[in-house]
């Protein structure tokens, strides 16, 4: 009998009234001069509203940008910066990189310079 209220509470905590899942990640796609970039930011400790309205809304000059909110980042990333520090604050996120795997030679060192962050190269 007690498990039903707990189940309902769990369901209410992860769904919106419309039935859609609360997003904990955002996929950002950008294009400039024929170059396409796609990454996914997965929230670890950023306040939800700040994550959605700030971190997932990049202001990139002369680029077409599309943002999609998802429950979690999809598989297929060539690299993931785990526990990345967000904007020199205590906030943390995991950043998944898709596209050109050779970009890891720049992204990995930048990731590893952040305190507590670590680079992962998932099996593709």
Where are these regions (language model features)?
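Mitochondrial intermembrane space
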Residues: 20-124
